[in-house]
């Protein structure tokens, strides 16, 4: 039986098939993406470089001598490759376990195609078992938490974490997310919220799902 790490490695390798020649690609953040970066290093001569969604991924890319571009220098990205904490059958996701959700959402928004790489444990019928991360301006933390309670959630400050943008993360427990697009818009309209970890309005276009019998490609 394959371990979770072996499933992650399988999808990381499969993702190379979706990397166009001579392109600048978007690269996400997290344990599965770290494996993808290791694989990407083997074909780095085929690409121009990458736009990164976090300081951690930037450091890892640079360690492999892959050129990292500022997003403001890049007009478009053909593809963005990132993991997910949960993903449903409609390819809506919860992301932000690594606290990079805002930059991930920005880079994903620029890309023509979003490729999600995940193992089968992340594939769910309903989002919400994984606590929903919300990036919040620090002075608004208590207000935003009260508003999230009104939506039926139980927000908890992620201790000791400051995002790359200098903000805090509230992890919202206890949500059964029936309508991800609507909830994403509702939370994002709360004053003080930078963004929430629902990726439903900009969902994945392709899911590379690591399973015991191989990598399944879902669209």
Swiss-Prot record:
Q: What does this protein do?
A: Catalyzes the reversible conversion of ribose-5-phosphate to ribulose 5-phosphate.
Similarity field: Belongs to the ribose 5-phosphate isomerase family.
Pfam families from the entry?
A: Rib_5-P_isom_A
Q: Which organism is it from?
A: Chromobacterium violaceum (strain ATCC 12472 / DSM 30191 / JCM 1249 / CCUG 213 / NBRC 12614 / NCIMB 9131 / NCTC 9757 / MK)
Q: What is this protein called?
A: Ribose-5-phosphate isomerase A
Is ATP-binding tagged as a keyword? Answer: no
Q: Which NCBIfam families match?
A: PRK00702.1, rpiA
Which PANTHER family does this entry report, sorted A to Z? RIBOSE-5-PHOSPHATE ISOMERASE
EC no.?
A: 5.3.1.6
The gene is rpiA
| Coiled-coil positions | none
């Amino acid at each position: 039986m394959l371990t979770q790490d072996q499933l992650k490695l399988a999808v990381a390798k499969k993702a190379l098939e979706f990397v166009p020649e001579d392109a600048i690609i978007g690269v996400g953040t997290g344990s599965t993406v770290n494996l993808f970066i290791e694989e990407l290093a083997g074909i780095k001569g085929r690409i121009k470089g990458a736009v990164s969604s976090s300081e951690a991924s930037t450091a890892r890319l640079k360690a492999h001598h892959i050129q990292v571009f500022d997003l403001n220098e890049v007009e478009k990205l053909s593809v963005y490759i990132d993991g997910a904490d949960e993903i449903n059958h409609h390819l809506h996701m919860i992301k932000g376990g690594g606290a990079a959700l805002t930059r991930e959402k920005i880079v994903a928004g620029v890309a023509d195609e979003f490729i999600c790489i995940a193992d089968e444990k992340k594939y769910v019928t309903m989002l919400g078992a994984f606590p929903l991360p919300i990036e919040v301006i620090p002075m608004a933390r208590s207000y935003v938490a009260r508003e999230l309670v009104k939506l039926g959630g139980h927000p908890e400050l992620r201790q000791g974490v400051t995002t790359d943008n200098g903000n805090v993360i509230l992890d919202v427990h206890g949500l059964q997310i029936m309508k991800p697009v609507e909830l994403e818009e509702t939370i994002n309209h709360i004053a003080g919220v930078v963004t929430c970890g629902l990726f439903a309005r900009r969902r994945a276009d392709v899911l590379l799902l690591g399973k015991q019998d191989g990598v399944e490609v879902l669209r």
